[in-house]
Amino acid sequence: MSSSTDNNKGFEVVIDEGETFNDACLPQLLRLPKQTWPILNAELCERFSYYGIKTVLVIYLTKSLMMSDSDGKAYYHAFSMVSYFTGVLGAMMADSFLGKYKTIIWSLVLYSISEIVLTLTTIPSIGKGNSAGPLIGLFATAVACGNIKPCMAAFGGDQFNQKDTGLISTFFSLFYMSVNVGAMLTMIFVPMIRTDIKCYGSDCYPVVFGVNCIVIILATVSLFLGSPFYVKKEPEGSIMIRVFKIIGHALSRKMKSSEETYHHWLYYAQDKYDKTEIDDVKSLMKVLVMYLPLPVFWALFHQQGSSWTLQATQMDGDFGGGVMLRSDQIQFFNPVLVLILIPAFNIVIYPMFERCRLGLSPLKKMVGGMLLAAVAFAITGFMQIKIQDVQSPPPAPPATMTSVDFINVSPCEVIELNPSSFLKISLPYGQNTGHKIGQSGNRTFKVKGTNCFKKVDFYTNEVTVSLKAGARQTVLLDIADDGMMESTVVDHLFPAVSVTKAHTRVRTFYVPSGNMSDLVHLTYDHVIEKKDSVVVKNFTSYNGTYDFILADEYQLLVRPWNSQNGYNIKLPSENLKLGTFGAYTITLKRPKHQKYSRDLVAHLYEDVDSTSVHRLWQLPQYVVITAGEVMFSVTGLEFAYSQAPPSMKSVLQACWLLTTAFGDLLVVILSVAKPVDGVEKEMFLYGGIMLVVAFIFAVMSYFYTYSDFSGNITTNPADEKEIEESKLNSADSTTHL
């Protein structure tokens, strides 16, 4: 998130000596035209709805529509790209044909319809899991949002008289606050709705999109109810269209004329257009050349909602005590950090450079922002390497040896192997030895079970196990109802994990008592992420293969295959926490000292350590990218507005939107092309591209000559209002993306 508002003089509230803040501000609020309040409410609701979709979008695409991560990223950035491209079209349509009010209200109607389509098609019984319906709804939403983006602030400004500069400043402050409040609220609460409400056995996207749909309908109704009171100005023509006409006419005459020569090709248009207009377009194009490298920054910055969110899905957000930082909720750090870093740069960092006689020009600040973005992606790449540092399974034994893990799955308080031997193994109830290397072949052990069915009893007999050479195996030690000690040998095979998915591996041994069914349905029920439960049907007692499931906290449900009534299960803790890329063994067995029981006790063994990287470790990359945003975006807006004539401000705003759109387009292209394999390599690639572009931009900046338009700026309140509107629109376009 970024904004130029912190440096806008029009946003300052001056409090006379002796006045309290409320004394100074409350009258201003009460004096605002009544028709501005529906506009502010509509803006807050529209921003909430837009970011409510965008915050969860990449997770919805990859986890619900089951797209690959690269395809999910491509569609995410295509959604963003369309909203910024159509922002330019919306501005031209409002200025040339419909006017601002009609453009906004009809776009809100389209917005509402498209979100209804999106909500309905996420319902499994309607959408059938097909991506066509949701994608149509998303595309229409992006078009509607784009049309509104450049119009709402300007329409609000139209409600004031030219002399009400103080009220205009108050309105724009409230407008910017509405944008921020809408975005921040949705980044906090929508992920909670996604995970905490369960419908159709999974994350409740119909409710997520349904809430956003209701909010955008409220925005539409709010704006419509104020219609009788609005000042609705007629379209006056688009300056952007006029710029295109001047450029087109100049190029046409230059190609046709062989006699006339001018020191700049734009002056070929002076037969039809005023020289002042041509000079303004010439100044504009000088700035637009400096815009050419800017899309690369936005290509990196916008991946907070795609690549960084996907990275967060592979990390651990548990703070303990039931407090969870969700993978899409972490995006909230960006707006919070903006509020901290903008004053930090203005009050501390920039003055410190000045005191050291290292003054930073606007272009130098922008280069610094680009370099920080590159550093942020380098951090992201190294973080991905850490996340993907999958731990190895226990070492394989030598060719003539075996590696064995003994587990006590009996109700005995203690099981001892070779109890009279110096090398005896003692296993308390539910405990295991971990993998031990020993001799392979047929091995006979004397096994003693103590306090098995009573608190004072013991059973002893020999068991023979066949241990494979060069293999890892698990030996489960149990006791039969007649008191005979038993053993079951299961191969312990570790399937490789995919580092692109936040999976874990789990195998479960079900060891029932004599009055329980040997064939059951086993369910791993998600606790944190409300995904579809993982159901293993017709599960048998010693099925030792690993299942791949999403890393999460789980409850276990076991019921006989021919019954709806499950067994009571006592877990070792409140839930079973299975970490990313780990490997786990779960045993379900009789309670201690019980021969017959309808209850089961679960024990969890970590066969391979999980890669447990907390989501808070993403905070450094968020701090760096946000610092880069403050240096790049805020300064970029100030640079652009200082280097172009006042008549070209709206064109600069439109072109700023286009740099954002082209940044998204770059991500779409690279996501589809897949020039490198591996997320970490992709992050380093983006960081490398940013470094190269920062160097090119630094060279361009070195040869750039600053212009001074201070003599051309009028103090006409209408002009000041137009500049404030343009700055706010551009700030909105780059702040909450």
Segments and roles (model prediction):
Residues 2-454, 461-462, 468-737:
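Hydrophobic transmembrane alpha-helices of multi-pass solute transporters/permeases
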